């Protein structure tokens, strides 16, 4: 706990310097936190994790590094060209290199000893920046991945859903079917970015750090991939730490303070870059990550959208027209089919926004809304059979359109896990 107090205490011996730098026409603003009066200091540029971040998110660590004699640049992450649905690791890497160039010009900094530090998404970006420029003297990563972003996301989502007690078809839908569709539809930028070629190209020393209880990055796989890919490395695992190397009891909660030894390790390593490579044993994982494969020929995004529109139209169209005989099974099909499709869309939105936390109680591995949708799906199949009998007797276009909706519903529901265990 003493370490955490030191890391978060006011910077008794650190001075700030405002800097600006540009990349691709975008001006970025940052702060250099450094010990006052220092000369020939090593420098460190801190590269953000995913999402919107300002320099203040990393100030406590920058101040801790500055107290160890490291001039540390923190900056506000770009907002132009970066969002949930748009991002480029290449652009972010160039942002980091622009920050490196700005830090190397500082009078208190030794330009030959400036490196990059990257957390999470920054663990993809920082090595990419280093691979592009010899001006980057070293790389530090926290919670970095050795796998593609889509694969990491699937592993992390499954961890969260299983923690909530969920299992079965909903988990498969969220971690495979939905992610594959989002990636193919361009809604998951950089989904299939492969970090391994970049890691293999690095010649700078790399300090890779992971929490053994990380539930966002598969840490065991990451350690193994870094060890087999890098030329010069120091790989360390902190036993009671989570993704950001905060103290934790289970990987999900965040206790006060950083993992004991983390901040000091970065300081000593940066000041004395090791000539030889060392690595801790990979931490155990409950299960391995699985690749999020590209869509097959029969599951393109446009087909899923077309099926969705057709189902909504077929089920909603039937009750709008009262002409001709109305079978009870047809009324049930129109009702259950429409409610199931709309309910699925609602559940998926809640799932994406809250990572399953707002889906309510879980019964037999299924949250109640999903269980209700599965029961409605069975009812829709039964109503489709009854409607087929009614259509055979009456052969009306009204029943035919509705029956077509029921027929399309069956493979659609199987694909999305509504008719699955």
Question: Each predicted region: which residue ranges?
Answer:
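Alpha/beta-hydrolase active-site loop
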Residues: 87-106
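Short beta-strand/loop motif that positions the catalytic acidic residue
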Residues: 202, 208-210, 214
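Catalytic active-site module of serine/aspartate enzymes centered on a nucleophile-bearing elbow/loop
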Residues: 241-244, 250-303
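The serine-hydrolase catalytic nucleophile loop
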Residues: 51-62, 77, 220
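Alpha-helical transmembrane segments of integral membrane proteins
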Residues: 299-421
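Conserved alpha/beta-hydrolase
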Residues: 64-82
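N-terminal cap/lid segment of alpha/beta-hydrolase-fold proteins
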Residues: 14-38
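Short beta-strand element of the alpha/beta-hydrolase
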Residues: 40-49
